[in-house]
Regions:
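General structural signal for secondary-structure boundaries
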Residues: 91-94, 214-216, 347
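Glycine- and other small-residue-rich loops at beta-strand/loop junctions that grip anionic moieties
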Residues: 7, 61, 65, 85-86, ...
Length: 360
C-alpha cells in the first residue's frame, strides 16, 4: 500500500522533481511588520476556507484505511477546508454529502459513457456539491512500474507475498478482515468493476478513459454543470488561456503527482507563467509535491490562490485514519503560520511575488 501512495510513473523523475523544485525558490523576508495575528483565511470558488490548502481527489481510500474517504472529509471539515471526492472513491458522493456541511468538490472525468458523466453532474447538484473538478491528464493510465514490481492489485489479493506483508502489519490486516467491503461506490450501481475476474480494476479504469476528449467536450460539461468549475492537470500558459476561454472558474496546476507522464515540469515552476497568462480571471490551485508549510507559502507567493494536498494526507490516513489526517493538516497549518510570521506577512492577502525569488 505504501508504494501505491508513494510511487510515480516510469523513472519517477517528475515525482521527485515535484518536491525538489521548491528548493529552487528562496523566500525573501520583510521584517519589522506586526505579525502578532496571523490570518490564513482565503475565499475559493466563492467559499470561505480557514486555511489556503485543501484535500485533493485521490481514488480508493479504502485501500489505506477502513474509514476511507469519510474520515478524510470529516478531518477537512474540522479544519475548515474543502474536500474533493474522486470519481474512483470507495465512498459515494451522497455519503460524503451527509458527512459534512463544509465546501465540497467532486472530481469527474469525461468518460466514454457520456450519460454516466451527465449522471454524475445531476447527482452532484442533488447533493449540493459546490464545484466540479475535471481531470484532463488521463487519456490513459500512466506506467506505474512500482505497482507492477510490488504486485499491487485492487482490492488486495491474498498471495504468499501479500500475506507476509499483511502479517507484518496486523492492525491494518485486522481492519481489512473486519471491513472487507471494497467497491467503486460512485459507479457500483452501473457496473461492478471488481466482479469480472478477467479484468483488473486498472484495466477497467483505463478502458473508460476517452482519448477523443476535446475542449468542446469541456465546454459542454461546463454548461451542463453551470457552477464553479476547475480543470485539473494543466501545466502551460496556453492551456490556462483555453480554460479561461471555455468558461472555467479555475485551473489546478498538476501533473497527477508524477503518476502520469514522466518528465513534465513541477507545478510550482508553472505558476508564474500561467498567472501572467490569465491575470486574475482564473483561480489557480497548485497540486503536487507539497510536504511543508513553507511549500504552501512559496506557491501562494508566486501567484497561486490555494494549494491541494494528496500524498501528504494519505500517509496520515494510512497511519491513523481521521486522526492521522487531522494531524497532517494541523502540522501544515502550524508550519504555514510560523512561516508567515518569519516572512513578515500577517495575512495571505498580503503575499506577493516580492517575497520570493528563484535561485539562479
Amino acid at each position: 500500500m505504501f508504494h501505491y501512495i508513494d510511487g510515480g510513473a516510469d523513472d519517477e523523475v517528475t515525482l521527485r522533481r515535484n518536491t525538489a523544485a521548491y528548493e529552487d525558490y528562496d523566500l525573501q523576508p520583510s521584517f519589522l511588520n506586526p505579525v502578532d495575528k496571523i490570518d490564513t483565511r482565503i475565499n475559493l470558488f466563492g467559499k470561505n476556507l480557514d486555511i489556503p490548502f485543501f484535500i485533493a481527489p485521490t481514488g480508493m481510500s479504502r485501500l489505506f484505511h477502513h474509514t476511507k474517504e469519510n474520515a478524510v472529509a470529516r478531518a477537512a471539515d474540522k479544519h475548515g477546508t474543502a474536500y474533493t471526492l474522486s470519481t474512483l472513491g470507495t465512498a459515494s458522493l451522497e455519503e460524503i454529502a451527509k458527512e459534512t456541511d463544509g465546501p465540497k468538490m467532486f472530481q469527474i472525468y469525461i468518460l466514454k459513457n457520456r450519460e454516466l458523466t451527465k449522471e454524475f453532474v445531476s447527482r452532484c447538484k442533488d447533493a449540493n456539491y459546490d464545484a466540479l473538478c475535471l481531470t484532463v491528464d488521463t487519456p490513459m493510465a500512466g506506467n506505474r512500474e512500482r505497482d507492477k514490481i510490488t504486485g499491487m492489485t485492487m482490492p488486495p489479493r491474498f498471495t504468499f507475498k501479500s500475506l507476509l506483508s499483511f502479517a507484518l502489519h496486523p492492525s491494518w490486516s485486522f481492519n481489512l478482515l473486519l471491513h472487507p467491503d471494497f467497491r467503486l461506490a460512485n459507479v457500483a450501481h452501473r457496473v461492478d468493476a471488481l466482479a469480472n475476474s478477467t479484468m483488473s480494476l486498472i484495466e477497467y479504469v483505463n478502458s473508460q478513459f476517452d482519448r477523443t476528449v476535446s475542449w468542446d467536450d469541456v465546454a459542454w460539461l461546463i454548461q451542463e454543470w453551470n457552477g464553479p468549475f476547475i480543470i485539473k492537470g494543466l501545466l502551460t500558459a496556453d492551456d490556462a488561456k483555453r480554460a479561461k476561454d471555455v468558461g472555467a472558474s479555475g485551473v489546478m496546476i498538476s501533473n497527477h503527482g508524477g503518476r502520469q507522464l514522466d518528465g513534465t515540469p513541477a507545478p510550482i515552476d508553472c505558476i508564474a507563467s500561467m498567472r501572467e497568462a490569465v491575470g486574475n480571471d482564473l483561480e489557480l490551485i497548485v497540486d503536487g509535491g507539497i510536504r511543508r508549510g513553507t511549500h504552501i507559502l512559496k506557491a501562494l507567493a508566486l501567484g497561486a490562490d490555494a494549494v491541494s494536498i494528496g500524498k501528504a494526507y494519505l500517509y496520515g490516513l494510512g497511519a491513523g485514519g481521521q486522526k492521522g489526517v487531522e494531524l497532517v493538516l494541523e502540522m501544515l497549518r502550524n508550519e504555514l503560520e510560523r512561516g508567515m510570521a518569519l516572512l513578515g506577512v500577517s495575512s495571505i492577502s498580503k503575499l506577493s511575488n516580492k517575497y520570493i525569488q528563484k535561485r539562479l
